[in-house]
């Protein structure tokens, strides 16, 4: 299981961070607004995975649930907007030819990750002191990340940062669902056309 966890980490860096960062810059430079808007939504939602890393550094059980939910909502954010998808289909160029396979690939990657993540969901409801081998194996990656990037910052500070960012994310997400969501996307388009 450890090998699978480390493989997931490596893949997430390449397909979940590096590739969309390059695509975002490319979309901005080439002024492809549909791709740019889809990717800014992706980055907003995928920040939940970054928050998960900070929660895992603190060995908080809720991190397992947060990470699993992130793997569900991230692909949704890539496909949800009908207007952007329609605009994307009208666009031409190399970036579109790169973006579309990446979007399918990352969606497949997160679908598989969601299925595999169900094996770790029990960790979300287990006290830290009773973590089994699988739960502890998941913690290895964030703890190594902490040692490399945040070696001088105490774990409680990073954990508090993760909790604060989760609260901020939840407030923004709730605000979006209550105020913005009804006025945009699929439901707004249907309502406007009737």
Locate each region found by the language model.
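N-terminal signal-anchor/start-transfer transmembrane helix
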Residues: 15-32, 174-177
């Amino acid at each position: 299981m450890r090998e699978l966890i480390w493989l997931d980490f490596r893949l997430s860096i390449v397909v979940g961070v590096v590739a969309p960062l390059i695509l975002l810059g490319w979309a901005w430079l080439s002024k492809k607004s549909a791709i740019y808007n889809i990717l800014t939504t992706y980055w907003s939602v995928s920040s939940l995975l970054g928050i998960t890393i900070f929660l895992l550094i603190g060995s908080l059980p809720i991190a397992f649930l947060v990470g699993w939910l992130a793997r569900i909502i991230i692909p949704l954010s890539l496909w949800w907007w009908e207007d952007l998808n329609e605009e994307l289909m009208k666009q031409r160029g190399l970036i579109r030819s790169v973006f579309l396979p990446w979007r399918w690939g990352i969606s497949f990657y997160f679908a598989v990750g969601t299925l595999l993540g169900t094996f770790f969901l029990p960790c979300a409801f287990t006290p830290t002191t009773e973590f089994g081998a699988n739960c502890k194996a998941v913690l290895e990656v964030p703890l190594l990340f902490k040692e490399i990037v945040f070696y001088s910052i105490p774990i409680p500070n990073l954990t508090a940062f993760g909790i604060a960012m989760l609260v901020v994310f939840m407030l923004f997400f709730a605000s979006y669902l209550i105020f913005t969501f009804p006025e945009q996307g699929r439901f707004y388009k249907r309502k406007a056309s009737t």
